[in-house]
């Protein structure tokens, strides 16, 4: 928060916006450790979810096309405003581009000053996995040891690491319609010392698992999981159904047990629960974390977490990355906002730059 007395003494105030590039975030993760980063983001998420009512929240603003979606995800409290820009284009691999690309901003509510601009493509993968783990710790059986990963794309390693380090999952059952994706995941998880088993279809992969994570990318009303695949005590972590017309769970799977979500107004539009009537009962996860509502009631109960990704999680992740960058002395700044001698004279800023370039132009002209 700005000190007004200090502001009055300053003739010119320079706004230096902290910047975290993709390369800098990767360096931060390597120095801190990916497991610690996932755990750290999870802790920040829990902290912010327990302050749920302090935030001004809304469903994300989405622009849909035939090939994908572009979204803005805002959230704010009394001190800080945050947003994420994110896309979802399942066919981007054809152009050698990620399916999901994102960046985000933290800004000061009092002045509107952008304090941080950060990549969020890598960070979103970490926060999504961290959020899945936060939900599973509240909803899955505490003795869970095996998890099926249906969909072995860019998010899958992060999910596996989150569930291994935060919940103690020991073995991962893997399936993807793209065998190359599973090859990649097996290689990466084996390198990290995690146990994997690959399967030829979803039904075989989920059999006997304590937790089932679906994280597929196709923008279609799919039925990755059907009711006959669900076993007593399972926790379903549905990650991939995250926009209108994009689902992973058969509607009857949602009737197998209590359904939990992040922000109900958004989840009813975007989650697997978009298939259900408006009065279908759901519980927001913050209510479970705060103790207001019950999560899992008994060991054989099936629990379903219908995740779509919510702006508050990105706020948490941005806070974490900013704080760790500061801790590791890895901050850098950019000049995003012009420094004005007179805040009412924006045109003068352009003129000053033109005048400063005058001698350079004259020297170039003489040399010619």
Task: Kindly give the residue locations of the regions a language model identified.
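NAD(P)-binding Rossmann-fold cofactor-contacting core
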Residues: 166-192
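Glycine-rich Rossmann-fold phosphate-binding loop(s) that bind the pyrophosphate
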Residues: 152-153
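Rossmann-fold NAD(P)-binding glycine/threonine-rich loop
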Residues: 229-234, 238-294
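Short, well-ordered coil/turn residues at beta-beta hairpins
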Residues: 213-216, 238-239, 262, 318
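N-terminal Rossmann-fold NAD(P) dinucleotide-binding loop
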Residues: 156-157
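Rossmann-fold NAD(P) dinucleotide-binding segment
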Residues: 203, 208, 219-235, 251
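N-terminal ligand-binding/catalytic initiation module
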Residues: 1-125, 133, 143, 312-315, ...
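Short helix-loop-beta connector
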Residues: 139-146, 168, 231-232
């Amino acid at each position: 928060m700005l000190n007004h007395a200090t502001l009055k003494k300053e003739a010119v105030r320079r706004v230096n916006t902290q910047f975290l590039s993709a390369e800098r975030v990767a360096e931060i993760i390597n120095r801190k450790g990916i497991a610690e980063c996932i755990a750290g983001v999870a802790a920040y998420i829990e902290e912010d979810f327990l302050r749920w009512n302090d935030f001004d929240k809304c469903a994300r603003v989405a622009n849909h096309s035939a090939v994908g979606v572009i979204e803005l995800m805002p959230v704010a409290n009394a001190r800080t405003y945050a947003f994420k820009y994110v896309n979802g284009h399942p066919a981007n691999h054809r152009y050698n581009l990620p399916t999901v690309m994102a960046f985000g901003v933290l800004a000061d509510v009092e002045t509107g000053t952008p304090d941080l601009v950060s990549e969020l493509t890598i960070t979103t993968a970490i926060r999504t996995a961290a959020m899945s783990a936060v939900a599973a710790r509240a909803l899955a059986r505490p003795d869970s040891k095996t998890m099926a990963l249906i969909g072995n794309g860019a998010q899958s390693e992060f999910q596996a690491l989150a569930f291994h380090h935060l919940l103690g999952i020991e073995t991962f059952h893997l399936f993807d319609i793209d065998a190359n994706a599973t090859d990649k995941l097996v290689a990466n998880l084996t390198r990290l010392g995690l146990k994997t088993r690959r399967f030829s279809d979803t039904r075989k992969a989920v059999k006997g698992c304590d937790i089932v994570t679906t994280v597929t990318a196709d923008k279609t009303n799919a039925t990755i999981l059907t009711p006959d695949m669900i076993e007593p005590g399972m926790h379903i972590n549905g990650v991939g159904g995250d926009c209108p017309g994009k689902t992973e769970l058969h509607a009857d799977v949602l009737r197998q047990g209590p359904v939990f979500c992040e922000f109900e107004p958004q989840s009813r539009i975007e989650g697997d629960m978009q298939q259900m009537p408006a009065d279908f009962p759901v519980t927001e996860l913050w209510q479970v974390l705060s103790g207001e509502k019950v999560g899992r009631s008994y060991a054989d109960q099936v629990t379903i977490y219908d995740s779509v990704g919510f702006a508050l999680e990105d706020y948490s992740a941005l806070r974490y990355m900013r704080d760790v960058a500061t801790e590791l002395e890895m901050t850098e700044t950019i000049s995003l906002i012009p420094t004005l001698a007179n805040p009412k004279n924006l045109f003068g800023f352009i003129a000053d730059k033109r005048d400063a370039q005058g001698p350079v132009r004259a020297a170039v002209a003489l040399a010619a």
